[in-house]
Amino acid sequence: MEEFVRQCFNPMIVELAEKAMKEYGEDLKIETNKFAAICTHLEVCFMYSDFHFINEQGESIIVELDDPNALLKHRFEIIEGRDRTMAWTVVNSICNTTGAEKPKFLPDLYDYKENRFIEIGVTRREVHIYYLEKANKIKSEKTHIHIFSFTGEEMATKADYTLDEESRARIKTRLFTIRQEMASRGLWDSFVSPKEAKKQLKKDLKSQGQCAGSPTKVSRRTSPALRILEPMWMDSNPTATLRASFLKCPKK
């Protein structure tokens, strides 16, 4: 799984995921599924923000090519991917500037057009189940929730999907590709099943020549900074210049 992640995600995304896991004492060599899920969530957040700007008239526009003469502001502020201290500094600054209500939990993005924080979720389960879990945790109507699945489904607060259909389709296609690439390498089942994950971990440790006494238990602890995890796997926390370039997964 670790090799797959390093091949299939932008190096900047991988680096951010490594820093997040290191900050909370998590070993990516052991918790490889979490490593993959953090990278997936980061990429979705960056794709959500990509190409969306606000022009001089305050209108939301999509620009895929940089125009040095255009006075444009990024529509979305990316909060996900920052260390906790910096992330809260950004959130506080946004609240002071816009008058937005400070969220209880760190969100993933801020939408300057709709003036709201956004929580992004990526799940392999039924989207409505994960949405309800997320809403129950956040307990705030001020934070907009948008959930994507690896099967192409999505769910958002009040059916307001924020982005245009084409932008959302890019995200869904990327998630489907990740799923297919994992499956082709025999990694998908272990990514979504705790039992299969343990088997895969034991197999990986054995292939790495580690001793029989090496730890094989997969941690179920959820890092505070990586709250958008489902109960076992990561679903989901920099600047405007850190936009992901999306690499196709090379075949074996």
Curated annotation (Swiss-Prot):
The keyword Ion transport does not apply. GO terms for molecular function: RNA binding. Keywords: Decay of host mRNAs by virus, Eukaryotic host gene expression shutoff by virus, Host cytoplasm, Host gene expression shutoff by virus, Host mRNA suppression by virus, Host nucleus, Host-virus interaction. InterPro entries: PA/PA-X, PA/PA-X_sf. One of its GO terms (biological process) is viral translational frameshifting. It is found in: Host cytoplasm; Host nucleus. The record marks 28, 65, 202-203, 206 as: Important for efficient shutoff activity. The record marks 195, 198-199 as: Important for efficient shutoff activity and nuclear localization. The active site is at 80, 108. It holds the Pfam family Flu_PA. The probable endonuclease active site in the N-terminus and the basic amino acid cluster in the C-terminus are important for the shutoff activity. The C-terminus acts as a nuclear localization signal. The C-terminus is recruited to host protein complexes involved in nuclear Pol II RNA processing. Belongs to the influenza viruses PA-X family. Plays a major role in the shutoff of the host protein expression by cleaving mRNAs probably via an endonuclease activity. This host shutoff allows the virus to escape from the host antiviral response. Hijacks host RNA splicing machinery to selectively target host RNAs containing introns for destruction. This may explain the preferential degradation of RNAs that have undergone co- or post-transcriptional processing. This is Protein PA-X. It comes from Influenza A virus (strain A/Leningrad/134/1957 H2N2). The gene is PA.
